[in-house]
Curated annotation (Swiss-Prot):
CDD domains: Ribosomal_L16_L10e (cd01433)
Region annotated Disordered, chain positions: 1-20
Composition skew (Basic residues), residue ranges: 1-13
Subunit-level organization: Part of the 50S ribosomal subunit.
Protein name as annotated: Large ribosomal subunit protein uL16
InterPro entries found in the cross-reference section: Ribosomal_uL16 (IPR047873), Ribosomal_uL16_bact-type (IPR000114), Ribosomal_uL16_CS (IPR020798), Ribosomal_uL16_dom (IPR016180), Ribosomal_uL16_sf (IPR036920)
Keywords associated with the record: Ribonucleoprotein, Ribosomal protein, RNA-binding, rRNA-binding, tRNA-binding
Molecular function in Gene Ontology: rRNA binding; structural constituent of ribosome; tRNA binding
Organism per entry: Bordetella avium (strain 197N)
KW Isomerase (keyword) present: no
Organism ancestry: Bacteria, Pseudomonadati, Pseudomonadota, Betaproteobacteria, Burkholderiales
Gene3D superfamilies, per the entry: Ribosomal protein L10e/L16
Cited function: Binds 23S rRNA and is also seen to make contacts with the A and possibly P site tRNAs.
Superkingdom to which the source organism belongs: Bacteria
Length: 138
């Protein structure tokens, strides 16, 4: 699964996920993309599950790019532990997603196959998404 190899600090504050995606909002590498229309967090497991769904559907047909990376640690305290005594340990990694962000890209397959593969991938994700095609000349 995806996670950073090294970080300067182990834990991070929660923060707020606001605004729209300005970077990574266009299909840059492939012909088709899966773009987020909702906002939220994608865990490394969800990103991997969607990637597997895409790969399984297109078989050996095309090429896939994952445009997001889970670089934010989420800490959790163990079950049945009293409040206080510091922050919990990092449990998993997430990518903060803003509306407009392209999550996955694909090339080398037909549009119908890409649409179906992205539909299967979107079912694995907790945010709303839409299918986008690359604008030639843009």
């Amino acid at each position: 699964m995806l996670q950073p190899s090294r970080r300067k600090y182990r834990k991070e504050q929660k923060g707020r996920n606001t605004g729209l995606a300005t970077r990574g909002a266009q299909v840059s590498f492939g012909e088709f993309g899966l773009k987020a229309t909702g906002r939220g967090r994608l865990t490394a497991r969800q990103i991997e599950a969607a990637r597997r769904a895409i790969n399984r559907h297109i078989k050996r047909g095309g090429r896939i790019w994952i445009r997001i990376f889970p670089d934010k640690p989420i800490s959790q305290k163990p079950a049945e532990v009293r409040m206080g005594n510091g922050k919990g340990n990092p449990e998993y990694w997430v990518a903060e997603i803003q509306p407009g962000k392209v999550l996955y890209e694909m090339e080398g397959v037909s549009e119908e196959l890409a649409r179906e593969a992205f539909r299967l991938a979107a079912a694995k994700l907790p945010i709303s998404t839409t299918f986008v095609a690359r604008h030639i000349g843009a």
